[in-house]
Amino acid sequence: MMSWMRVFLAVIACFLVAAVPASAGQVNPQLLVLRQADVPAGFALDREQSGQRTNETESKGDRRLPALLERWGRVTGYETEYDHRDGTLTSRADLFRNAEGSRLMMAYVVDEAKTSGIKGLRRTPVRIGSGGWLYGGGSGAGAFNLVIWRHQRVFAGLAAFGVQKDRMLGLARAQQRRIAAAVR
């Protein structure tokens, strides 16, 4: 009887390990980004620049990315872009099979930001999701802010020209609420 119980527990354990990654694909990635109602007045959705971001589309132009995305377990992603006469706001989210994938993506983006040599942006930690960073510089219409963070198996980011830091953090928190509701 004891060996039967071990087999049963082993089968259950295998099922649970397989079930969590399989469920990652069941999240609608469109639910992970900002919607029109979330963004400041005057910003309009650019339908041509918005939509699902498959691994294939994300890998174009960088031969390293297909292998990295596969290794990280990226399932899919989604991006919305909103345009305004004074700027652009982009909301994106990448869905992974597990939290390790979102952690690896975050580390990659932070490393790329360090090595890219972008001058004039200040990096500040933010308490959104499991933690993240705000890269910001400039003011008024010339302001550029990028917020990146992760939550469970989601890596998320917001980038904007012409949107001030405090407003960006509010938008990131709104997107985080959408993410938390979608990946429960």
Question: Model segments located where?
Answer:
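Short, surface-exposed beta-strand/loop micro-motifs that present aromatic residues
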Residues: T76-D83, A143-H151
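Surface-exposed amphipathic alpha-helical segments
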Residues: G157-R184
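Bacterial N-terminal signal peptides
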Residues: F8-A18
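Sec/Tat signal peptide C-region and signal peptidase I cleavage site
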Residues: V20-A24
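Short, compositionally biased low-complexity segments enriched in polar/charged residues
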Residues: A41-T90, D94-F96, E100
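Short, well-ordered beta-strand elements
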Residues: T90-R92, W149, R153-G162
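Bacterial N-terminal signal peptides that target proteins for export
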Residues: M1-L9
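Short Gly/Thr-rich strand-loop-strand
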Residues: D46-G61, A67-L68, E100-V147, A174, ...
